[in-house]
Amino acid sequence: MYLSSYSFMEPDEPFYLYYPSWLNVWESHSYNTALKTTGANGWRFKRFGSRREIYTREITRRPEHTPYINALDKVSDAALHSMSAKERMMLLKSRTAFIYIDSWGESGVFEYNISSLNLSTIDTLPKNLVKKFSISDVTCKIRGENFSLYQAMAMAQDYLAWDVFDFVVICGGYRAVPLLAFTAESMIQSEVKNKKRLIPGINISIERVGCFIFSKRESDLKIHCGPYIPTATNNPHLPDVENTDDIDLLAYAGGINKTKPFPHTGIDLIARYGCSGCMTPALSWQYINQYALHNGCLRTVIPGVVSGYAYFDTWYQ
């Protein structure tokens, strides 16, 4: 399948340092555990709706939710209008499926002073986006933590291969809720607990939203989702998986632990762009665009929690 159009957005707000609070013992405990497992000495968050005027220690916990919802709308507009007028009209009149993704599922309970309407937008499905793309067929939401985008792409790949739909639109974002970010990293890095980073530093979590439009119409980026590989070695070049002779670059969208050296031939997306949960794998396309790569293939690897990994390949012209 081909990536016909896509758009990213991250907050304009600055980074804010997280401060543990005795009012939330479990969150503070998860924070300390996550620091140990990632070998860091602090955590910075960049979130939509962060407000400088509130108490400093609460900035990362209590952002406004409206800017996040508005960002989803803006990024969808950008992806739609980056297509040609002919393609845009074809999308609106063709068989189109809509998939909404996020990392946490029903996370509205962590939002501050949220209405029931906005709660349903974040937790279930943004109805304004469904109307924007004139979706009259399939809509669904995938909550798969770091694998959300990969699972949605695999579903889109099947839909297009079976000729069920002409276009598949995937929209979603990563809401960097501190407690959930801490527990997620603790699970990913549990096997390397209590080790120190090669270079001590601060973890960075950045909220990002994205919209991706897939079709069978030829474009500059061709995507293929591989299977999940249940192996304990986490080696993305296993010879019995798939021929890797045409892989020029390897992008790693794993946990943010830095206790082991990263191979020189690979791209650590989190070290380069910051951690964005389910949106992190899509940063490999941003890397291709940023460095204007031509005529090659980039493999993006998403490691599992226990062992194994999933991957998808991107051929760029």
Q: Residue spans of the language-model regions?
A:
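Conserved "HGTGT" condensation-loop signature of ketosynthase/thiolase-family condensing enzymes
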Residues: 1-146, 158-164, 174-177, 185-317
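Beta-rich nucleic-acid/ligand-interaction surfaces
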Residues: 149-150
